[in-house]
Amino acid sequence: MTSHRAQRPSPDEYPSFYAGYVSQVPDGDVVEALIGGAEIAAALLHDLDEERGDHAYAPGKWTLKEVLLHCADAERIFVYRALRIARGDQTPLPGWDENAYAPLSGAGARSMDSIMDELESVREGSVTLFHGLPEDAWTRTGNANGKPITVRALAWITAGHLLHHLGVVQERYLG
């Protein structure tokens, strides 16, 4: 029997909005994909200077530092949802406004090193949670932002969200 964490979630396990994130994740064990995403981030973003971190590729767009803190914020929210649902909590979980969070993140006052440390720490916590889940938790369904979603889908969304943003960073901030 294949582990639930190695099975890509079916489209009925998550809102269609997240399909692009799920599709970013390579086939196989999603915990390994989470680890791989952290390695990609470290390789891509190591040794970037502060000027690069404070750069936005267009007026009204987030700076690189804001993008990275958005990734940390989103991951915390996805993983919090996964924890609640994995533990059988059926409380509907609210949505959140990423565009309201970014300007309040304090990204401009932080160093790239501190932001990278935070992103790495958040990812380590995510890996630890998902690695330790019992097999039956992966298929539990809860409600987030008014829509049904499974723990498995949240793991794949978590992995794919960072990969998506690393692609944007490569193309628009570093390219």
Predicted regions and their residues:
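A glycine-rich, hydrophobic loop/mini-helix early in the fold
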Residues: L34-W62
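Residues that cap or delimit alpha-helices
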Residues: P26, D49, P134-E135
